[in-house]
């Protein structure tokens, strides 16, 4: 019997991401898995139900998608109620935030589901393809600078015009991890003067 992989629509307010793309769904289908995606799961990320269907995934209601699922993929872990009908001992791969959401972790244990908290995936070469934090931190650093530029209300680069000279914005980045490095690169590309600090020595 083929492995059944389910993807539910994210329920958290303001969450527009989806745990699977049609491209990856197509790869899973090619490997012999059955992929089921809830209707509208990808709309927030501009991925249509039709795109998932073309990739070979089943598209349906939440109950139909999760029925007999062996693996459930999520950006944020769904409540156990949303997993009703999944196979006993089903694996759920998502971000769980277990230290703040201990009640949800306890509910998973009581229901008999295997919780794979993807944010704790070790940052080693072998696990690089499953490193959810790096990809999201990269985007966070990029978006942080764009948001700051929008709030700043003036131009980032130096501009010499007939009306006078506008000095380049000075951007200070605290921390040069994945997000910080992307923030530095984005601010530099926008023309700002950038400096940074980190708790680690150079």
Model-based region annotation:
Residues 77, 139, 177-178:
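Residue-level detector of alpha-helix initiation sites
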Residues 8-47, 155-202:
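Glycine-rich phosphate/diphosphate-binding loop of Rossmann-like nucleotide-binding domains
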Residues 67, 139-142, 146, 181, ...:
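A broad detector of short, well-ordered amphipathic alpha-helices
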């Amino acid at each position: 019997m083929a492995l059944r992989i389910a993807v539910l629509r994210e329920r958290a307010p303001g969450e527009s991401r989806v745990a699977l793309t049609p491209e990856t769904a197509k790869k899973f289908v090619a490997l012999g898995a059955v992929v089921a995606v809830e209707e509208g799961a990808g709309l927030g990320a501009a991925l249509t139900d039709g795109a998932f269907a073309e990739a070979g995934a089943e598209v349906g209601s939440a109950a139909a998608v999760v029925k007999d699922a062996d693996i459930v993929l999520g950006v944020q872990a769904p409540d156990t109620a949303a997993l009703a009908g999944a196979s006993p001992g089903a694996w759920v791969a998502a971000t769980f935030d277990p230290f703040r959401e201990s009640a949800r972790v306890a509910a998973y244990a009581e229901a008999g589901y295997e919780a794979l908290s993807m944010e704790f995936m070790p940052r080693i070469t072998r696990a690089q393809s499953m490193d959810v934090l790096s990809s999201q931190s990269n985007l966070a650093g990029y978006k942080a600078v764009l948001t700051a530029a929008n709030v700043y209300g003036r131009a980032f680069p130096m501009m010499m015009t007939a009306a006078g000279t506008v000095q380049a914005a000075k951007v200070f980045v605290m921390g040069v991890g994945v997000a910080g490095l992307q923030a530095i690169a984005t601010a530099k590309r926008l023309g700002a003067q950038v400096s940074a600090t980190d708790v680690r020595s150079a």
